[in-house]
A protein has these predicted regions:
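Short, Lys/Arg-enriched N-terminal segments with co-localized hydrophobic residues
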Residues: 1-6
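Extracytoplasmic
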Residues: 237, 250-256, 266, 298-300, ...
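Non-transmembrane functional regions of envelope-associated proteins
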Residues: 8-298
Length: 330
């Protein structure tokens, strides 16, 4: 009996003695337990820790030089001082658009939404003061002729300028029900989307789902394609990830970034790659292929940003300099 007791005690002490292998086993078991407890949803506490770790890694790495293939035309304070408060009359935006096209960019992206008509258009301006002009002869004929004159319709001027080059117009999605959704109102990207799984449908995708879009007015919606520019900051206001696609009525719509990248590459299709693990009624993404380029995403189709650096890391041009032709090149 003493021998058995001694062996049992020795075995217990041996099992309790810490070793790197045992520590690894404990960590793996703890991680599995946490994953089983929380599933795909990461608690806010752990998400906050992840975000801070990522921030620290970018600060330690420092600024990375850009390729100068992306140039940002900024409607900055100097532009507002010179051309007036925003929003500008759209004949000025049309002139800015044309001057950017003249510089020869591969694609022009607008992270601006033109959801209402330009109230400064002369044709609309005179129409609002119809009562003042009521004493004039043939006022209705005059106003109709003014409305058809493209030089007096700023929205048509901007639409024609946008259509003269390769561009992507931005729009936004709303996610809360506001009872303003209209049937038949949807964006019109020129992208073809396919799935790499034959047994899946768009309705199966695990993505953000929008309630309705806020799109550009028809006179201006003349771009080569359209893409949303919604962003979703974390609790500290930092944007760590961006969605490449958002679902609307069980159809995935691409972001402004995806469409600009695709048009630069000259591709017509994006292929969504689905995970073979998990519930087939809620398929997670693993990435997106555009041409020969594979872009890895999280399960919701979000891309983790690789920050190049702080503000002004990419080349910025003042819109005022572009409009004035002050020796700037794009």
């Amino acid at each position: 009996m003493p021998g058995i007791y001694h062996m049992t005690k020795h075995l217990i002490l041996s099992l309790l003695r810490p070793t790197p292998f045992k520590a690894g086993v404990v960590c793996i078991l703890a991680a599995c337990l946490l994953w089983y407890s929380f599933g795909y949803e990461k608690p806010d506490f752990f998400s906050a820790i992840d975000a801070r770790i990522v921030d620290t890694m970018f600060r330690v790495r420092g600024v990375e030089k850009t390729t100068d293939s992306v140039v940002i035309v900024d409607i900055d304070e100097r532009s507002l001082q010179e051309y007036g408060q925003w929003p500008w009359p759209r004949n000025i935006v049309a002139e800015l658009t044309q001057k950017i096209y003249d510089a020869g960019p591969l694609v022009l992206g607008f992270d601006i939404l033109f959801a209402e008509k330009d109230r400064t258009s002369p044709a609309d301006l005179f129409n609002r003061y119809r009562s003042v002009l009521s004493g004039c002869n043939n006022i209705d004929t005059l106003l109709a002729a003014m409305k058809e004159n493209p030089e007096l319709n700023h929205d048509r001027l901007l639409g024609e300028a946008i259509a003269s080059g390769t561009s992507v117009l931005g729009y936004m999605f709303l996610f809360r029900e506001d009872f303003l959704k209209s049937s038949g109102v949807s964006p019109f990207p020129s992208l073809n989307i396919s799935l790499d799984a034959k047994d899946a449908d768009f309705s199966d995708l695990r993505m953000l789902r929008a309630y309705r879009p806020i799109i550009n007015i028809p006179e201006i919606a003349t771009a080569s394609s359209e893409g949303f520019f919604n962003v979703f900051p974390d609790q500290n206001g930092t944007v760590l990830k961006v969605p490449l696609f958002i679902m609307l009525d069980n159809i995935p719509y691409p972001s402004l970034d995806v469409e600009m990248f695709r048009l630069v590459r000259g591709d017509q299709e994006a292929r969504l790659h689905l995970s073979k693990i998990g519930d087939k009624r809620s398929r997670a993404l693993i990435g997106v292929s555009i041409g020969n380029t594979f872009i890895r995403t999280d399960d919701l189709g979000h891309l983790t940003l690789n920050f190049r650096g702080p503000y002004n890391t990419f080349p910025y041009l003042s819109a005022a300099d572009v409009l004035n032709g002050s020796g700037v090149s794009i």
